[in-house]
Amino acid sequence: MELMYLEYAANGFYLLAVFLAARNSIHTWWLGIIGCLLFAALFYQVKLYAEVLLMLFFVVTNGIGWYQWGRQSGVKQVTNTPLWRLAGYSALAALVTLLYGYILHSMTDAYAPFIDSAILMFSVIAQFLLMNRKLETWWFWLVVNTVAVPLYFSRELQLTAIVYIGFWFNAWYGLYLWRALRSAAARGA
């Protein structure tokens, strides 16, 4: 598939999946699987190997998230993650970023291996938080999208970079909506 068409298709599916995640919709997961498979092919072609690994990880976690959200009935509760746990996740992600970035730098022709690795690791945390409906997922997505946009522009993936700017705004939207869901649940509504 030509790179441009692959980029359009990947972004189309993924854009809808990310929007539906902010809306707390189960359909985020199957659309995400399709988008991630398309993005894996795209990122492989532009030598963003940590992004390929991330997309394959997302395929698996989208399947798990789809299953988890599908077996829950009624209102899906949004909760918080303890600060100490977030600090631990962040420290672990930083350490693995350095290690994996070094491996990519030393053993492959990867482009921007440390930045690519940081996107990978902090996206992993964000994805697990999303799967468990933790409010803080949106803060991690804000960081990931902030770092990813210039990387994608640097690889001439303009459409992807622009879509990730949209994801950045969607993360703010998701944060707003999920705060409202959490507050409504706390009030017993």
Q: Which residue ranges define each predicted feature?
A:
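Short, hydrophobic transmembrane alpha-helix segments
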Residues: 19-27, 41-48
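Alpha-helical interaction segments
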Residues: 29, 48, 128-131
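Short glycine/serine/threonine-biased micro-segments
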Residues: 30, 45, 154
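Polytopic alpha-helical membrane-helix bundles and their juxtamembrane interface segments
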Residues: 1-24, 69-73, 80-189
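Alpha-helical membrane segments and adjacent membrane-interface helices in multi-pass membrane proteins
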Residues: 33-42, 46-70
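Generic detector of intrinsically disordered, low-complexity, polar/charged segments
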Residues: 29-32, 62, 85, 171
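Hydrophobic alpha-helical membrane segments of integral membrane proteins
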Residues: 30-34, 52-56, 139-143, 161-163
